[in-house]
């Protein structure tokens, strides 16, 4: 359950219908085998931990949605694209992605789905590169916390073109139920 008062971004009203991109069946030439799909999705989390987009195969038109809100290429949230956000260290406040569990990989549609935990200790130095100055951030950004996430990736031609995440805040260091 994503609630506006708990999440950094929340537009549950925009989650009523699946985005058409996720239903599209890929041509044979656009597909990746299951193990490659999981490796590509996992590179996203490696990129978060290492603060670089260099190791993540982002499609030039990649977009990410968090709790229904478009969090890339969107001037009202963060104007930068997927790769640019990583290269600009926008996620440097996330220090660990743990309990990674990939539950589904669909070669025909290029989808990977899993559940994960992001750890955010809330230390000022972790926000050095964040687009908003630390003293202007809402408390929810720098309060020590973890996020339980379910994320789905659309991968076409070996590149991540779309990411859909649903998340909820939990106490920092919370254990997973999986």
Residue ranges and their predicted role:
Residues 1-178:
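C-terminal and inter-domain tail/linker signature
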């Amino acid at each position: 359950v994503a609630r506006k008062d708990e999440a950094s971004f929340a537009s549950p009203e925009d989650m009523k219908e699946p985005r058409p991109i996720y239903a599209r069946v890929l041509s044979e030439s656009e597909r990746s085998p299951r193990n490659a799909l999981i490796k590509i999705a996992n590179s996203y989390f490696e990129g978060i931990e290492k603060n670089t987009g260099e190791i993540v195969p982002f499609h030039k038109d990649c977009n990410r949605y968090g709790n229904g809100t478009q969090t890339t290429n969107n001037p009202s949230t963060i104007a930068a694209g997927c790769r640019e956000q990583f290269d600009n260290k926008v996620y440097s406040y996330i220090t660990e992605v743990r309990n990674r569990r990939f539950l589904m990989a669909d070669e025909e549609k290029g989808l990977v789905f899993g559940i994960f935990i992001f750890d955010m200790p809330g230390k000022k130095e972790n926000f050095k590169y964040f687009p908003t100055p630390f003293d202007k951030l809402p408390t929810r950004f720098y309060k020590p916390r973890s996020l339980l996430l379910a994320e789905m990736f659309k991968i076409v031609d070996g590149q991540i073109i779309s990411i859909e995440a649903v998340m909820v805040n939990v106490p920092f260091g919370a254990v997973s139920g999986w």
